[in-house]
UniProtKB/Swiss-Prot annotation:
Binds 1 zinc ion per subunit. Its EC number is 6.3.4.20. Belongs to the QueC family. It catalyses: 7-carboxy-7-deazaguanine + NH4(+) + ATP = 7-cyano-7-deazaguanine + ADP + phosphate + H2O + H(+). Zn(2+) binds at residues 196, 206, 209, 212. It comes from Novosphingobium aromaticivorans (strain ATCC 700278 / DSM 12444 / CCUG 56034 / CIP 105152 / NBRC 16084 / F199). This is 7-cyano-7-deazaguanine synthase. GO terms for molecular function: ATP binding; ligase activity, forming carbon-nitrogen bonds; zinc ion binding. GO terms for biological process: queuosine biosynthetic process. InterPro entries: QueC (IPR018317), Rossmann-like_a/b/a_fold (IPR014729).
Length: 233
């Protein structure tokens, strides 16, 4: 059980909690840094809906201040293997932006997190983007995070009054193995999190999508058990 419970009068931070490993570690780090966590999970009608259950489990284990699961049906737009009837690639991590990229997803999600933060009187957002062991999504890059901070300064009441909004991306330059070790250091249960984009009918992770491959390799390099049941080899 994590032991980083913040003080009752600690500042609030909105943490995007997808239910994946990176977002779980991000929430744990926010607590370790002394923030009370407002966890925001977006139910965008994604293919891998099991990650919503993972987000609930993580929020409960961490004892966050509040956990909101916000419905936003991005299947109405499509354009991604996660939100449309497009096959999830199973042939390894490539160099091009894959079809699992959801158009502008992190921009949309951070905008919603910013709205909640402003309503709650918070000036801190946390997002678990990573620019090393990742699938090449453009909205995981450092320049995206820096650009969103600039946008938040222009678009919000706190910014217009001379304040700042900080977007914390503490995993941005970590390898997946380092993220796995952070989970262990924080006392988090890796098995609470979910990474697979295309779960098997029996509930196991496919084991061969980009996200599974990155997770498996990271935990193997770290010498840790990731608590996931895999199929697919």
């Amino acid at each position: 059980m994590p032991s980083n419970s913040p003080a009752p009068d600690a500042p609030l931070a909105v943490v995007l909690l997808s239910g994946g490993l990176d977002s779980m570690v991000c929430a744990g780090l926010a607590q370790e840094q002394g923030f009370r966590v407002l966890a925001l999970t977006i139910d965008y009608n994604q293919r891998h809906r099991v990650e919503l259950d993972a987000a609930r489990a993580i929020a409960a284990r961490l004892g966050v201040e509040r956990h909101v699961i916000l419905p936003l049906d991005l299947r109405q737009f499509g354009g991604s293997a996660l939100t449309a009837d497009i096959a999830v690639p199973k042939d390894g991590v490539g160099d091009d932006i894959p079809v699992t990229y959801v158009p502008a997803r992190n921009l949309i999600f951070l905008s919603l997190a910013l709205a909640w933060a402003e309503a709650a009187g918070s000036k801190d957002l946390f997002i678990g983007v990573n620019a090393l062991d990742y699938s090449g999504y453009p909205d995981c890059r450092p320049e995206f995070v820096a650009g969103f901070e600039d946008l938040a300064r222009i678009a919000t009441k706190v910014g217009s009054e001379g304040g700042t909004v900080t977007v914390h991306a503490p995993l941005q330059h970590l390898k997946k193995s380092e993220i796995a070790r952070e989970a262990a250091r924080l006392g988090l249960e890796a098995g609470d999190s979910w990474s697979c984009y295309d779960p098997l009918p029996d509930g196991r992770a496919c084991g061969v999508c980009d996200s599974c491959r990155l997770r498996r390799a990271g935990f193997e390099e770290a010498g840790l058990n990731d608590g996931t049941r895999y199929g697919g080899g």
